[in-house]
UniProtKB/Swiss-Prot annotation:
SS bond partners: none
PANTHER family tied to this protein: IOJAP SUPERFAMILY ORTHOLOG (PTHR21043), MITOCHONDRIAL ASSEMBLY OF RIBOSOMAL LARGE SUBUNIT PROTEIN 1 (PTHR21043:SF0)
Gene3D superfamilies (alphabetical): Beta Polymerase, domain 2
Stated name of the protein: Uncharacterized protein K12H4.2
UniProt GO molecular function: ribosomal large subunit binding
SUPFAM superfamilies tied to this protein: Nucleotidyltransferase
Top-level taxon in the UniProt lineage: Eukaryota
InterPro entries: Iojap/RsfS/C7orf30 (IPR004394), NT_sf (IPR043519)
Family: Belongs to the Iojap/RsfS family.
Organism the protein comes from: Caenorhabditis elegans
Amino acid sequence: MLTRFTRLRPILQLRYLAQNSHIEEEYFEELEPTGIISSHETSQEPPKRTGFRSQNLSEDADFVENVVGALTDQRAKDVFVVKSEETEMTPYTHKIICSAFNSRQASAISENLRSLLKIDGVSNGSMSHARRSTKRSNGWYVSEVERVQVHVMSEECREKYDLEAIWAGDDRILDEIDEEKQKILLPPRR
């Protein structure tokens, strides 16, 4: 017979780690530049932009495997990983999409992923910058973990938005998007 303590032991361990370890949360705000740019400043060339992908790609692959492992441990299903191309102007090296049975489980997966990665970062000595950018939704939660973007979606949201087809470059989806843009831009018939 299981006692209450043994059934709740993993939860108590997570609570103990969260309470007894120093976890910092960082929130970033973009500040608008103050001041007026003079004409002689605009004639100068902008500074060279360094790429987002200057870190080791094998470390990124290992990190993505850890994130996918954490998602499967949380019972996420249909995990789909998309590697961003070098030509894309995105700070993310990988995008991960997974499904949950309902929106409540999607919220729990997103929150548990964030807390597990923070606890893992504290134990390894490196702070993992994990933040959840979706506060309330109808089953779609987006988390940004270092250079990986994680989408946890309910089945209905995943079927509705079909991000895999858009990111994979499915021509059928891209043609539908172009048709919708044309409908919007055409003047109404009289």
